[in-house]
Amino acid sequence: SKSAWSKTIEAADEAYMPGTFTTFAGYEFTSSTLEREALHRNVIFRGTERMPALPFTRFNSINPEGLWNWMDKMREQGIESLAIPHNSNGSNGAMFMFTDWEGKAIDQEYADQRLRNEPLVEITQVKGTSDTHPLLSKNDEWANFEIFPLRTSTKLLSGPPGSYVRN
């Protein structure tokens, strides 16, 4: 809602202490489905002087390409942002698919748009690493660092292809 979004922006402004504590106004965009688990992105804005009236959410579209289109339109209006994919190790291969959302081959336009809007990726957090997996990096002695096979005592059925940055 506008009220919750306004409060998010206000909280970022109130907590900001130049040179001591940096805050960002942002939110989490989730586009998970039963087939595409754990598709989370943190969307962070540069400054709070120019902000969208409301964030782009799964109510607008669950397709991350829709998020990127929206971010590009916001950028044309002087509103800078970036999306940071995270928890890709739990995406069941959907975070870094070799096709677009609709199954079409990735082309240069897709790659450019994704890089423009998602220049960073979260590598490691409490839910495990999203860097690589021993099945993907057989010669990397550190590939088994923080592999997280369980989620809430349930086996994590996320396959390595498409779930890790170094795929």
Regions found by a protein language model. Give the residues of each.
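Extended, charged catalytic domains and RNA/DNA-binding interfaces, predominantly
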Residues: S1-N167
